Regions:
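Hydrophobic membrane-targeting alpha-helices
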Residues: 17-25
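Bacterial N-terminal signal peptides that target proteins for export
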Residues: 1-13, 23
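Extracellular/lumen-exposed scaffold segments
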Residues: 25-202
Length: 202
């Protein structure tokens, strides 16, 4: 009887340990938000794609506020992403989702509003060792006036091999990244043909 009770206690302890580990793994798929009432930023992660780790920089903007694309238009400042303090990271490739155009007193601007995720593809120096992604970001947010913003985030990616609730959002952001169009591609706006006349292409 005592042995049965001990087995039951052990089973309960094991179940609680598994639940706690799952909770920690789930929490590790996103860093805390860093920002203020106008905007905030965090890192999110998903499981790996082969040797590449998938993650994203998420910026959340308050209603009426916007931030900018890499080519901001007549006004504005593009975000600057710094991953230099990351651990065991060989390279980080950041993609820019398709932006929208805004017209205001400063002219035409190109950027984002609401919630935007910049997809990341990360290669580790040593895939057998944990990866810690560290971000510092400088960006601008604008309503009627533009103000500078900054943020930082840190996210260990070792637990990202597990399924993540961020996968649909990351997949949607990746789908918004413009794809290069080949000459003659009829599925999207593309150059159908090139003809050279003298020093000019027509």
């Amino acid at each position: 009887m005592i042995a049965t009770a001990l087995r039951q206690v052990g089973a309960v302890g094991l179940a609680l340990g598994i639940a706690a580990a799952a909770s920690r793994a789930h929490a590790a798929d996103a860093s805390p938000w860093d920002g203020d009432a106008r905007s905030s930023v965090r890192l999110i992660a998903d499981g790996p794609d082969g040797a590449t780790l998938r993650a994203g920089v998420e910026i959340r903007l308050a209603p009426g506020w916007k931030t900018y694309w890499r080519y901001p238009g007549d006004s504005g400042v593009p975000p600057r992403f710094d991953f230099a303090q990351s651990s065991n990271v060989k390279s980080v490739t950041l993609s820019w989702p398709s932006p929208r155009r805004f017209v205001d007193d400063g002219g035409q601007a190109i950027g984002y509003e609401g919630d935007v995720i910049f997809p990341l593809r990360i290669l580790a120096n040593n895939p057998a060792q944990p990866v810690v992604l560290r971000l510092k970001i400088d960006y601008a947010v604008c309503e009627k006036l533009c103000v500078p913003a900054e943020g930082s985030a840190e996210l260990p990616l070792a637990a990202a091999a597990l399924a993540s609730a961020n996968e649909p959002a990351l997949a949607a952001a990746e789908a918004r990244v413009p794809k290069p169009a080949s000459i003659g591609d009829r599925s999207t706006l593309a150059i159908r043909s090139l003809q050279k006349r003298g020093n000019f292409f027509l």
